[in-house]
From Swiss-Prot:
This is Mediator of RNA polymerase II transcription subunit 20. The lineage of its organism: Eukaryota, Metazoa, Ecdysozoa, Nematoda, Chromadorea. It comes from Caenorhabditis briggsae. The gene is mdt-20. The keyword Transcription regulation applies. InterPro entries: Mediator_Med20 (IPR013921). Belongs to the Mediator complex subunit 20 family.
Length: 198
């Protein structure tokens, strides 16, 4: 996994896919991301909602984040899929919020070997909430090495979205390693916005 930039697109998934196919992208398969809130059984300001996420690129992993004010201070973990089974046993403390679950399903494209672009339709239950695009630059895991190039790629391909960089791009000035949790944080933030859409 390289460095990813996730954003909500204003176009339909088909429109985005046509843009990608127009620049020579090859369809590689499908992808799925889900974002599932687990709320405290009794409302409390002491305990935060735990967000459990899965990404088809990491099929044996579960990502868990308790969102706070920003990424750096939010408790987070990467677990194996057995974590989902443990959550079921914690029903006395954490209750799954099925109504708040966001699923993103779509297609994965490869562009000139170095770029992977995932385009998916986000749904909450049976309601379509929007289109989410993940642009991944595969050759590096260091944000400062590729963030300007990624902004240029997004500007050239989509002619927009390049000015709203992900939070992790803005707060990283040193050559730190990017991880899948950074990608999942971006999906979490987008899912929170999508839930509020009517």
């Amino acid at each position: 996994m390289g460095v990813s930039w996730v954003f909500e697109a204003e176009q339909t998934a088909k429109s985005v896919e046509r843009i990608l196919e127009g620049i020579g992208a090859e369809l590689m398969g499908q992808f799925q991301v889900d974002v599932i809130p687990y709320n405290p059984a009794t409302p409390s300001t002491d305990y935060a909602t735990n967000i459990v996420m899965h990404h088809s690129k990491c099929p044996q992993s579960t990502f868990s984040i308790c969102p706070k004010t920003d990424f750096r201070v939010s408790p987070k973990a990467v677990c194996d899929r057995g974590f989902d089974l443990i959550l079921g046993k914690l029903a006395g403390g954490l209750v799954i919020d099925n109504a708040g679950k966001i699923e993103i399903n779509g297609n994965e494209y490869n562009i000139h070997s170095d770029w992977t672009v995932r385009v998916g339709t986000a749904t909450q239950g049976t309601t379509v909430k929007g289109v989410v695009v993940e642009v991944e630059y595969d050759p590096t895991v260091i944000i400062v090495q590729c963030r300007e190039m990624m902004a240029e790629f997004i500007k050239q391909v989509f002619n927009k979205y390049h000015e709203t960089q992900p939070e992790i791009f803005k707060i990283t000035e040193k050559p730190e390693r990017y991880s899948t949790l950074d990608t999942m944080w971006q999906y979490l933030q987008i899912a929170a916005k999508l839930r509020k859409k009517t």
